[in-house]
Amino acid sequence: MAKRYDQGYFDRWYRDGGIGGRQRLARKVALAVATAEYMLERPLRTVLDVGCGEGVWRTPLLKLRPRASYLGFDSSEYAIARYGRARNLRFARFGDFAALRPRPPVDLLVCSDVLHYVPTRELDRGLPGIAELCGGIAFLETFTRKDAASGDEDGFLGRDAGFYRRRFEALGFRHIGAHCWLSPRLAHHASELETA
């Protein structure tokens, strides 16, 4: 039976104790915002959230930066039907980003807890578009087979870190720590030890 990202799924993993809670999410958002602003040397203006689910990044993000423009995409018909209009969410699968360019490159591109569920062919189809859409920082929270992460293991693809690193670097991303990657547009701005 195919995995369903319905209300029951989001209740289980994000509301009923699930994985991390609001405080952890707020810290994650603050880290991504601060990193983007540090590297851009200006306030954050635009955010694209790929695989956004119910758009949970939106509230803590707008609490920090009320003027930021947030746009989310997800493949959950439930999440888009329920929250699409109120939270500026649209329907798309990861592979759709091979051609989908909903806006100019953004300051912060978020793809949190998504890539380790995306089949390799679809991942390889969508990643170049993700690189094009990122003008600042990409927060690519991804887990590997060696991580002791807890959470939804249904459909988890236990790849090694090199699998992701090779793909991200081939597209021009440079790792700067804590799931943050400099976009190809900013990669040359980092000092050697920022990317070591």
Show which residues each predicted segment covers.
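A conserved beta-strand element that flanks and buttresses the S-adenosyl-L-methionine
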Residues: 110
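Short catalytic micro-motifs in class I SAM-dependent methyltransferases
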Residues: 113-117
